[in-house]
Curated annotation (Swiss-Prot):
Keywords: DNA replication, Plasmid, Plasmid copy control. This is Probable replication-associated protein repA2. It holds the Pfam family IncFII_repA. GO terms for biological process: DNA replication; plasmid maintenance. Belongs to the IncFII RepA family. NCBIfam families: RepA_IncFII_LM. InterPro entries: Plasmid_replication_init_RepA. This protein is essential for plasmid replication; it is involved in copy control functions.
Length: 250
């Protein structure tokens, strides 16, 4: 293959899979930032020292980004963000998956897949530069590459100007939001047998829910909720119990 044609996809683009669950607002925000800024030409790519992840020593000879690798980086940064778990920092996708969805995988005439373009970008550039951390995964695969667990670092987010304090603020708000949601969705009535609900008329069931709510919330919380808010919670809990009863009696 002529040297000028050795790259199969000159302009790789991340194409997220269809019918995937919706990503968090923060991931949407981060992906938007990363798409608006040329992450491959960030000053960090020229000012950070490349470190050998195995020894911790500075790499004296280090290959910087050529245009083909820069194009690959622009695509794969978005893919990593898309699959990023905000709680563990883990990218929940293999290198092969990232390569496939960014259009970086190639096939030989015999049908063998190569993900070298993606794997070398990750192991030879992004990891030494400190944008990600990689851990080897134990596998029985006979492939000619080693799948890894990829974790995003604070330097990764600095590529598109998102600071660690911004991430921490989001995580704090997310934690509080989940806590509030669990509190809202909590079922206050525990029946030893779900069929007991069939023996209660609506008024009795609602009174039982009301008593449970009064026991659950403090006086100040009940004041803040107010009569209308309390009525709404009773409606929600009564509806949940009815659905639960119907589900178990199909």
């Amino acid at each position: 293959m002529p040297r000028k044609n050795y790259i199969c996809n000159l302009k790789p683009v991340f194409n997220p899979p269809k019918n995937e669950k919706k990503r968090s607002n923060f991931i949407d925000y981060a992906m938007k930032k990363a798409s608006e800024i040329d992450v491959a030409r960030s000053k960090l790519n020229y000012t950070l020292l490349a470190i050998d992840p195995k020894t911790g020593n500075i790499l004296p000879r280090f290959r910087r980004l050529n245009e083909h690798r820069a194009c690959a980086m622009r695509a794969i940064v978005l893919a990593m963000l898309y699959y990023w778990n905000t709680n563990s920092n883990l990218v929940e996708a293999s290198i092969e998956k990232l390569s496939d969805e960014c259009g970086l995988s190639t096939f030989s005439n015999s049908g063998n897949k190569s993900i070298t373009r993606a794997s070398r970008l990750i192991t030879d550039f992004m990891e030494p530069m400190g944008f990600i951390k990689c851990k080897r995964k134990k596998t029985q695969s006979s492939s000619n590459y080693i799948p890894k667990k990829i974790f995003l670092t604070s330097n990764f987010f600095m590529l598109f100007h998102i600071s660690q304090s911004t991430i921490n603020q989001y995580l704090s708000e997310q934690k509080q939001s989940i806590k509030n949601l669990k509190k809202e969705k909590k079922i206050f009535i525990s029946f030893s047998d779900i069929r007991v609900i069939s023996k209660l008329d609506e008024k009795a069931a609602r009174n039982k829910i009301l008593n449970a709510l009064i026991k659950y919330y403090s006086a100040s919380e009940l004041t803040k909720i107010g009569p209308q808010g309390l009525k709404k919670k009773i409606d929600i809990e009564y509806s949940n119990l009815c659905k639960l009863y119907k589900k178990n009696n199909k």
